Each structure stands twice: as C-alpha cells, then as structure tokens.
C-alpha cells in the first residue's frame, strides 16, 4: 500500500494518517487472504474482497459509498454487514459510489445515486449495499466511471446506468435537456439498460454496425468507457477529450466505436484499462498500448501507441489513476506519472514522480498478482506462498493506523 492520506477537510474530528512514499504492508490486513482489491481513478475509497468472499471497505464515505449505513470515513477495512450472507467476488469504485459483484452473478451498490449510478430504480441515496435492479444472465464484471456504472454479463452483453453526459452510457444520446432557458438537465438511467449498437466508422465518418460483439472486458475512466470483445476488437465511447477514445480525434462518441488502430495489427487485445483521461490495452503477447493524456501538460496520444519501455516484460496487471500508472510484471513493479504525485508510485520521498516507466526498487523480487490504483494511492496483492516470498515481504515496513 502506498499513497496519500485523506483530505484534512473531509472529517475534521478524526485523526488522519501520513502520506506513504514507499510500499508498506497494510497492518490491518496482515495475514488476511485477499482475492480482490478495488478502487478507481476517481475514488478515495477502497474495497477488499477476501478469498472466502467477505467484503471490507475503507476510505472516504461522504455519500455512503462504503455501504456501511452511514457517512463516516473508515481508516480500517470494515466488514460490509449488508453483504455478510453473500459471497463477493468483485467490486468497482466510482467517485462516490461502489458496485459489489457476488458469485451468483448479482450486483449490489451503495453511495451517491443522484444520477441513478447505483441502478436501484430511483435517485435516492443508498447507504447500505442494495441489489441493482437487473434481471437476466449472471453478471461477470463491474466497472465504474465517476457518476455512471457498467456491468457485463456472461454472454458478453453490456449494460450501463447513471449519468449519460458525453454519451458515456453508449445509448446514442448524451441525455441533455433544458429545464429552463439557462439550466441544463440530464435524463439519467436509474436501472441497467443494454448497450445495443456497436459501430465502426470510415474516413467519411459514416457508421457501420459491427455484428457478433461478445464483450469480454470493460474499463471506465471519469467519463469514458473502453471494451474488448471475444475477437480482440476494441471499442470505446463517451468523452473524447485528449484522444482518450483512441480514434485520432477529440469527438465524443454516443455508441461504442471500434478503434481502427487494432484492426491492422496482429495483436489480439485481451484486457483493457482506463485512467481518468487515458486508456490502455494489454495484448496476448504481452505488449502494452496507451492513448489519451497521461500527464498534466503537453501533448496527448490521439491513438494507441506501444509503451516501448515495457517490451520484454511479462505484464500481469495494470493500475490506472488520474495520470499515474502502475504495472505488475515478472517479479517487479513498474510505475510512472508526472508531478504532482502523492506517493502512489512508491518511488520514495526523494524521487516522487517519473515521466518514464521506473522500477519500484523496494518491490524487486516480489510477485504481485494484481495492482489497483485509486485517485492518489495504490493497492497491491502480493504472493506469499513460499518461504522466499514471506522473507521478501518481511523486508517491507508495516503501516498501521
């Protein structure tokens, strides 16, 4: 665990921790077998899922996104009592809301719901984990943008709900309407709605439907979504600023549009990832591509480009934050992100940021199963199966609240 403590103004009556500039063992979870760690590029809260399906949350809770029945921040992972009879297998975090996925393919949600992003059929706050109003095939993946949600079922069908701004729900509309001559409103989706149309566009901007799309992975940035199907075709939709959609322009896309760059490549994409203003893809042969804005200033990548510094690495997991990136590869962790950073790169207090991929030296020799990034922090799940694994982990300092 590395990164920034909470904002001083969030809950003044509660003491805050310190900024962690290098990786630490998270004391409250020491000895706990963790299956999933979830956060998000817009999120200041986290979800921990254990191997036996228990679900714990901690971090900011200003809208009840921890699902604990109140709006008090938690510094220590706290059991979500409303899910104690469920076996949780996955989770995703938006700005102020959370989705929880169970082994039965059901989805629960909690937190801010003013845009319907909790998917419970209304826009009332959701303080305890409540079942999303979805009927159909079991859900296998959940993802969250800032104020919208995406769920993927076992047939490869995508459903979205929440704020439709920029076309980020993929329903061929941005949902805008005028409440008065000077006040704008949105027709929010309060229940999951199927994404029906996937398209590709030619140079004349003419749209042609793409058939037989079975989505296998999906990821969300602040206001955009990227997905890959069973044939390795990559689609993106929503806000197009800084080229984060990968279509060589900055136009918003109201429905999923196929990224043409990958059509001419013999690189089957298997996973996609998204930060606030950028997207990434991992291919079957281990190559990593990035597009959009991964730094505070300067030029953006308007279409996918290979991350050359990662060539030759066996990449397993990628975590995306606001502009920072962390990668688990081989027996190392690699990170980069331009200043200002807040410790999420784990490079130490003397080298707090890096414009280029840099190995986190204190993680050398550690096998990281998964890396997840929040708004200004990083969570890593490390292997501890062997005596050597345990010895390597013992060299890390421990952080306790």
Which residues fall in each region the model found?
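Eukaryote-biased RCC1-like beta-propeller repeat architecture
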Residues: 1-401
